[in-house]
Amino acid sequence: MSIHVKNNIHWVGQRDWEVRDFHGTEYKTHKGTSYNSYLIREGKNVLIDTVDHKFSREFVQNLAAEIDLATIDYVVINHAEEDHAGALTELMARIPGTPIYCTHNAIDSITGHHHHPEWNFHPVKTGDSLDIGNGKQLVFIETPMLHWPDSMMTYMTEDAVLFSNDAFGQHYCDEHLFNDEVDQTELMEQCQRYYANILTPFSPLVTAKIKEVLGFNLPVSMVATSHGIVWREDPTQIILKYLEWADHYQEDRITLFYDSMSNNTRMMADAIAQGIHEVDPGVAVKIYNVARHDKNEILTQVFRSKGILVGSSTMNNVMMPKVAGMLEEITGLRFRNKRASAFGSYGWTGGAVDRIQTRLMDAGFDISISLKAKWRPDGSALAECREHGRQLARQWALHPLDAPRPLATTQATPAPEMPAAVTAAPKATAAAAEWDDDQAMLCTVCQWVYDPAQGEPDQLVAPGTPWAQVPDSFLCPGCGIGKEVFEPCAVEACV
């Protein structure tokens, strides 16, 4: 079954109502998902992306009912991951010589998944275009690490449709295809969940890439994503949201999560939350047991929060395993502009709290004092927990607590405005800031470190070259992204 998108563009993807786990079991898809593939019929027939490999045969059968496969002139693969390009083997068996347009990195990924190096690959880079007839072109825009090195977007001129790949999407299945046809609250919840759990580590690149795309001054009438709905009504709303979420996002919200063997740490969490509420009744407070709640919901709440409290009983002098796993996830997501504190109960040693505090510091949180309670907290210990909550509420307040609360309490900063005309993403050069000659620089995407003492001989950057003198054409050896995603870092702190 196909769905008309616009003019000669049709959706030919696959809905997946049943899927509940994505990326292995790392992402819970309670609302299902869709694998969006698009068929363009102009002077040339173009297929943009396929579907997940488990639907390969069904996809090709449905596509053959829509169009004579032999008349497909080009296949465009925006992303090589199996939920996008999974049906390629089944499809290319039917049309083996058809050109496949993708990035250089995608050729490696596609070949690694499908083991067909003989396919007719045509690598593209940002600014390359493909004439599809009737005065229309496809323009390609590389988006490395959003969220794979091979990722790109495709823009269709005249129709002004941006096929955005994973960006601006959501794991959300609905019989309706367009954003104006579905529940808006549910939709935005899934968009934020998707960003928080998948794209947060790449926020600096999100901002740079959106500004680069806007700098082309191309009109956008629709954003056709790879998962979930197509943005037809006011498509710039999701672009604005991404700019907001990428800008050290926080709300006036505090999240507590914990694990407990005997409910002692749970009692502490409840008391701390009570203390926060006593001092700042307007702040949103949520409590989660990591052993019982949806991990991705907790991570989304962490993304939204100005501060978090992480609690654990001590077991074998370390934290509970599920708390440790959650902190590993949080470290990888690289949240910014957030405060944190550890708490927990113990019997004879209290190693869990100290280890949590260290992990939170390593993850980039602004650390506040921690709290321990021995054995089951009594009335005095619970009073101490409530006082701890009161102190944190005062320290973490986004507004004077003795003044009337602002009307808009959920946002720490106003949403950014869409630039009227934006130039290409700014380069992190000496013009923007002056660095010491020995200043190391950290790639915020892959964590590779540029050490001036070592330089980067593979790119003809000699040892002893300060960052300000590194050419603007420099690309991170770890992820292939430019200087705009680097930030200062002490060498000893980065290695």
Swiss-Prot record:
Localization per record: Cytoplasm
Residues annotated as domain Rubredoxin-like: 438-489
Protein's name according to its UniProt entry: Anaerobic nitric oxide reductase flavorubredoxin
Entry's family note: In the N-terminal section; belongs to the zinc metallo-hydrolase group 3 family.
Binding site for Fe cation 1: 79, 81, 147, 166
Top-level taxon of the source organism: Bacteria
Assigned keywords, A-Z: Cytoplasm, Electron transport, Flavoprotein, FMN, Iron, Metal-binding, Oxidoreductase, Transport
Pathway this chain belongs to: Nitrogen metabolism; nitric oxide reduction
PANTHER family, sorted: ANAEROBIC NITRIC OXIDE REDUCTASE FLAVORUBREDOXIN
Record text on subunit structure and interactions: Homotetramer.
Positions that bind Fe cation 3: 443, 446, 476, 479
Function statement: Anaerobic nitric oxide reductase; uses NADH to detoxify nitric oxide (NO), protecting several 4Fe-4S NO-sensitive enzymes. Has at least 2 reductase partners, only one of which (NorW, flavorubredoxin reductase) has been identified. NO probably binds to the di-iron center; electrons enter from the NorW at rubredoxin and are transferred sequentially to the FMN center and the di-iron center. Also able to function as an aerobic oxygen reductase.
Cofactor needs: Fe cation; FMN
Lineage: Bacteria, Pseudomonadati, Pseudomonadota, Gammaproteobacteria, Aeromonadales
